[in-house]
Amino acid sequence: MDKKIGLFWLRDDFRFIKNHGLIEATTKHNQVVVFYLYKKDVFNYQEAQKWWLSKSLSNFKKKLNELNITLEIVETNSFKNFFDDLINKKDFAIYWNKVYEPDYLKFDKYLLNILKNKKIDHKRFKGNALNEIDEVKKGDGTPF
């Protein structure tokens, strides 16, 4: 087991089983911290989504507590600012599942580049989509 802290960035994938990022963090590290970045401005006028999110986080936290894993909910205005601060800490590895929205994909590209340049252990996993876009091919091997 790796002595570094394993961080799992919980996004919009609240599966407990077959959550590949969470599985990777818990099998490779003795200490795991799960964190959710809450951007208040995203939910300003979306009361139903806030309710769903609070219930999902509460249920996920209960399951994590059974495994002695902490869930930290961090309110931030910017993913970039949060990760710029986090990257200055050295003894961690980070895992997360992909979110397929364009803004998230753009940020993932930025984050993957920064983590690689800083030589921080990291891995992004397929999200809760059935197939990645580039995995679906026609019979002749070309994309649809």
Where does each model-flagged region fall?
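N-terminal beta-strand-loop-alpha-helix module at the start
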Residues: 1-70
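Short beta->alpha junction loops
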Residues: 69-78
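Beta-rich, aromatic/charged-enriched effector core domains that present basic-aromatic interfaces
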Residues: 78-144
